[in-house]
Amino acid sequence: MTQPIAKRFPTPPIDKLPDDIRSRLLGVQEKSGFVPNVFLTLAYRPDEFRAFFAYHDALMERDSGLTKAEREMIVVATSSANQCHYCVIAHGAILRIRAKNPQISDQIAVNYRKADITPRQRAMLDFAMKVSAEAHKISEQDFTDIAGHGFSDDDVWDIAAISAFFALSNRMANVTGMRPNDEFYMMGRLPK
């Protein structure tokens, strides 16, 4: 039985989307072999789609003091805490690929404190989780602690921004009933 991409809102046909959005979806499909459901679901509101992915790309694709794998660690840990099925599965796949580690995303999703990560990465995730769950409790001590692990002010901004951005993404995925593409489940688990 084929399940809907998202349970609660219609998914527009690709051929009916604005040219720029259709082009982006087809580019993603060409690169990965499928269109991730987040693209199709958010295309329901084209202006918001554009804003969402512009901010996503600014956070997740630029050069910074965080590796692309570390950014995905933040997404997986905070999405797990927010019980976002879509983001844990989709970004877990991306993390496995970027870290070249088939076990890391499962470890982080279940309990990042027991994952095979460095003390620096654990400090990063501790800060990210606090931003995600208790941002109102962030104190100067938190900034001192994370700086002690070699994170710059720009790195700390990135950790906070990724945590905050994916809180939005997690909530929209849950509200829309977005389901992960089947392709994500096996990505990065077996050597090519």
Residue ranges and their predicted role:
Residues 1-192:
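Hydrophobic alpha-helical segments
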